[in-house]
Amino acid sequence: MRKSIRQRAKPWCVPLGLTLLIYILLRSVFLIGYVPSASMEPTLHEGSFILGLRLYSEPKVGDIIILEKDGVLLVKRIAACPGDPVDLSQLEYVTAIPIPVWEETVLTVPEGCYFVLGDNAQNSWDSRYWAQPFVSRQQIVAKLINSFCHCLDK
């Protein structure tokens, strides 16, 4: 006796449905990536895999975020939120890298923007060095919720 199309398709419904659900979650809710540099060491090691949450409340100081800058995903820590003052004279700089000259040494973070730093001040290309030192809320892709093994050795 021949099986109908419905009977033949039935065993595939659950696996296909689960695959679709996982795909939707990974594309719209979660972000899986890796730490591309040593800028967040010792907190996050270069090559570690990370899990970010795309849907979250407003970032706050201390949050580790994944942001997009010039088409590249970066992992940084929020150092100042909208309205917070940033005293540039108190920040640690790497002397080999030219620092943009701002007219003021104390900047106020504009509304809808953030000032970000890497935990490894000696090896981080972050708000201290960017011509436009602030990251807009739209540039923030996800908030870090977990990191996984440092599987890629240098």
Predicted features along the sequence, with ranges:
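Extended hydrophobic leader/signal-anchor segments used for secretion and membrane insertion
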Residues: M1-K154
